[in-house]
């Protein structure tokens, strides 16, 4: 008897649950139908051609606006970087008073330069007209290849040129001791902030006299006249002006790097 009552109770609960679910489903369906009629009253069909075309049109417009924004932003960024080329000439001279260069032997040939040897260095830097001392060079060369048929070497170089209060320029690339080479200008500070371009390295006397011509882009302003005097014709006999070598006030730039 108890078993029969339990069965009837379970059956009653099950029927009640099913009826509630059915009513909820019908109520939900009625809500959807009402929502659909509201769309129809507004003259909008969720699955009709007008709604689809409007949706596609809106999406297309949004995509076009997005593309236009990034296109114009990219052009603005590119065009905002100055592309005017400015030339700057400097002499790098090793006058034998800076204990430079040093040679760190990491290669496998103890009696000659070979792959892997490191050469840190620092030399004096003068304006192209040799009238003023501007600073120093400082950096590191890694020997990549000894070239006996040309009586020289190939280095991978990374170094900077310091110009006192004006800032500095950094370069990177190959340095060949037996011919002219170009290195990339990788950046700068001070008046050289944003600099890019390349620099031509001309070997005059290895490793004590070098002449550089920078072709600089990206500078916000013209280079100061103090740095851009007419360069002395490069030769193995060039020498800085006496007042520049003696670092007299008239022969140096402001707070020149020493």
Swiss-Prot record:
Transmembrane segments: none annotated. Residues 1-56 form a transit peptide. This is Allene oxide cyclase 3, chloroplastic. The keyword Chloroplast applies. It holds the Pfam family Allene_ox_cyc. Keywords: Chloroplast, Isomerase, Plastid, Transit peptide. GO terms for biological process: jasmonic acid biosynthetic process; response to fungus.
């Amino acid at each position: 008897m108890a078993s029969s009552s339990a069965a009837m109770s379970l059956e009653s609960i099950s029927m009640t649950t099913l009826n509630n679910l059915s009513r909820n489903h019908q109520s939900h369906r009625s809500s959807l139908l009402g929502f659909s009629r509201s769309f129809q009253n507004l003259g909008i069909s969720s699955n009709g051609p007008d709604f689809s075309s409007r949706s596609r049109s809106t999406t297309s417009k949004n995509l076009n606006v997005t593309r236009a924004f990034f296109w114009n932003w990219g052009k603005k960024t590119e065009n905002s970087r100055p592309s005017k080329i400015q030339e700057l000439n400097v002499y790098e001279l090793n006058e034998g008073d800076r204990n430079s260069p040093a040679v760190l032997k990491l290669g496998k040939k103890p009696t000659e330069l070979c792959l892997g040897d490191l050469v840190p260095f620092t030399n004096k830097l003068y304006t192209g007209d040799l009238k003023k001392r501007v600073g120093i060079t400082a950096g590191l060369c890694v020997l990549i290849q000894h070239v006996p048929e040309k009586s020289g070497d190939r280095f991978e170089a990374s170094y900077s040129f310091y110009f006192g209060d004006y800032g500095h320029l950094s370069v990177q690339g190959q340095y060949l001791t037996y011919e002219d080479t170009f290195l990339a200008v990788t950046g700068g500070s001070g008046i050289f902030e944003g600099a890019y371009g390349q620099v031509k390295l001309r070997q005059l006397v290895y490793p004590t006299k070098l002449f550089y011509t920078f072709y600089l882009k990206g500078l916000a302003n013209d280079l100061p006249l103090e740095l851009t005097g007419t360069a002395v014709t490069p030769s193995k006999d060039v020498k800085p002006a006496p007042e520049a070598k003696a670092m007299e006030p008239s022969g140096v730039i402001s707070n020149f790097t020493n």
